[in-house]
Amino acid sequence: MRFHWIPTLTVLLVLSMSFGTEAIPXXXXXXXXXXXXXXXXXXXXXXXSEVLECYFECGNWEGTCCDTGICVGIHNCKIPEN
C-alpha cells in the first residue's frame, strides 16, 4: 500500500489528457491545430507580431484584440488613442 498513489496518479494523468483533447469540438480542434501551427510561425517571426496577435485574439476578425486594440478589416490592429 506504500506505492498505491503512483498508479492513481498515472490514471488521473491519462484521463485528464484524454478529456482535454476530446472536450474540444471537432471543428475547434481543427482550428486549434491550425492555430498551433501558426503560433509556431508567429514565434519564429516576431517582427510582425501585432498583426498576428490581432488575428489570433480576435478570432472573428472583428472585436477587441491586441489587448486594447480593435481588429479592423481582415487582420489589421488599430489601437485607439486615448
UniProtKB/Swiss-Prot annotation:
SS bond list = C54-C66, C58-C71, C65-C77
Q: Found in which tissues?
A: Expressed by the venom duct.
Per UniProt, subcellular location reads as: Secreted
List the GO terms this entry assigns under cellular component, sorted alphabetically.
Answer: extracellular region
- Give this protein's Gene Ontology molecular function annotations: ion channel regulator activity; toxin activity
Propeptide per record: which residue ranges? 24-48
Protein purpose: Acts as a neurotoxin by inhibiting an ion channel.
User: What's written under domain?
Assistant: The cysteine framework is VI/VII (C-C-CC-C-C).
Q: What is this protein called?
A: Turripeptide Lol6.1
Q: Which organism is it from?
A: Iotyrris olangoensis (Sea snail)
